[in-house]
């Protein structure tokens, strides 16, 4: 494993101003955010009029500004796409994150000074995929969230292109941005940030014509949330250039807490200090937002682990197991969880 010459960049999400400011204050090296169009998060983002101020606010604090353009673009939209890209360039953004290789080529044509990053929506899972993105102008590639540490190590050994990986946040049951269930069932395009999240619904299971009793495990397609704090030293040592936190729909508290957690972990790993994770921090991360945190795909693909089936949304912090209910007093007796739970 070979470290890079400088510490990896920490990139935090921003849905709008409160999250952007929280990311800056918590120590992000870069913040990524979208506009109101051509973004995989349709309900949040900045207007074209707000864009210059957002970029300037970040640059005033020596924080990079990355703008997402991470959807596919149709021919009928190319004029609007050109206007948006020109505005991103004029605002002084440090990079634009793209999915569509046609858009990547368009950036090189109309804004050659604007850096292009290949989005995780490209589903790049090999060094050959990295080379393809680089051939279309990508200086950095955000690898698929479905890769293991071993996969990342092999890709890193085969390319010098900057590599970025997600270290925290929601996972897609499909390859990111490739799921068609939302469009097919509800007419809402997941690629355009309108995902209806069919993966978060409760399902019945029929096996050979017979109903299977699922009890409380009916969320058969709902993955847990990624948390790679324990994997930060490995990711630093194998030479990943940027660590990304998912969550443009999350609030400022989430952005502040996750950014602080990974800022501390990256700094400790780079200095080769003890990277023991504070149990109190883990409890805070569970409490701010969690569908069940773990390394999941980074530890290898096992859907029996990634998908627990019990919770489609935020679970909160586990306090223990109910052992007795005192109806007369309106009280519940709870046994705390064991240390290894």
Q: What residue spans do the PLM features occupy?
A:
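Surface-exposed amphipathic alpha-helical tracts and adjacent flexible/coil segments at the periphery
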Residues: 1-25, 30-40, 55, 61-68, ...
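Alpha-helical multi-pass membrane segments and their bilayer interfacial helix-loop junctions
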Residues: 42-45, 70
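Aromatic- and glycine-enriched glycan-recognition loops and surfaces
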Residues: 44-52
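Alpha-helix capping/helix-boundary segments
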Residues: 102-103
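Aromatic/His-enriched, Gly/Pro-containing loop or helix-boundary segments
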Residues: 119-124, 142-144
């Amino acid at each position: 494993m070979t470290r890079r010459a400088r510490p990896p960049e920490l990139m935090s999400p921003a849905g709008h101003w409160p999250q952007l400011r929280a990311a800056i204050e918590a120590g992000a090296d870069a913040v990524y955010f979208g506009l109101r169009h051509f973004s995989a998060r349709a309900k949040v983002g900045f207007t074209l009029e707000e864009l210059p101020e957002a970029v300037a606010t970040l640059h005033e604090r020596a924080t990079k500004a990355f703008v997402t353009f991470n959807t596919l673009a149709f021919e009928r939209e190319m004029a609007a796409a050109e206007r948006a890209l020109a505005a991103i360039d004029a605002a002084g953004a440090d990079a634009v994150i793209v999915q569509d290789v046609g858009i990547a080529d368009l950036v090189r044509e109309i804004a050659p000074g604007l850096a292009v990053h290949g989005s995780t929506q490209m589903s790049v899972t090999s060094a050959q995929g990295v080379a393809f993105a680089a051939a279309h102008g990508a200086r950095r590639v955000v690898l698929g969230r479905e890769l293991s540490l071993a996969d990342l190590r092999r890709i890193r050994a085969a390319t010098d292109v900057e590599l970025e990986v997600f270290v925290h946040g929601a996972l897609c049951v499909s390859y990111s941005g490739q799921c068609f269930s939302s469009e097919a069932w509800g007419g809402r395009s997941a690629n355009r940030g309108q995902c209806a999240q069919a993966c978060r619904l409760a399902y019945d299971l029929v096996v050979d014509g017979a109903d299977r009793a699922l009890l409380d495990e009916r969320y058969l397609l709902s993955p847990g949330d990624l948390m790679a704090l324990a994997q930060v030293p490995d990711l630093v040592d194998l030479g990943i250039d940027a660590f990304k936190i998912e969550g443009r729909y999350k609030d400022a508290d989430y952005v502040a807490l996750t950014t602080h957690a990974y800022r501390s972990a990256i700094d400790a790993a780079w200095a080769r200090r003890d990277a023991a994770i504070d149990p109190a921090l883990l409890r805070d991360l569970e409490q701010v937002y969690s569908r069940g945190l773990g390394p999941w795909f980074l530890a290898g693909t096992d859907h029996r682990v990634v998908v627990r089936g019990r919770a489609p949304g935020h679970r909160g912090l586990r306090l223990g197991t109910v052992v007795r209910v005192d109806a007369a007093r309106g009280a519940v007796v709870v046994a705390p969880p064991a240390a290894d739970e």
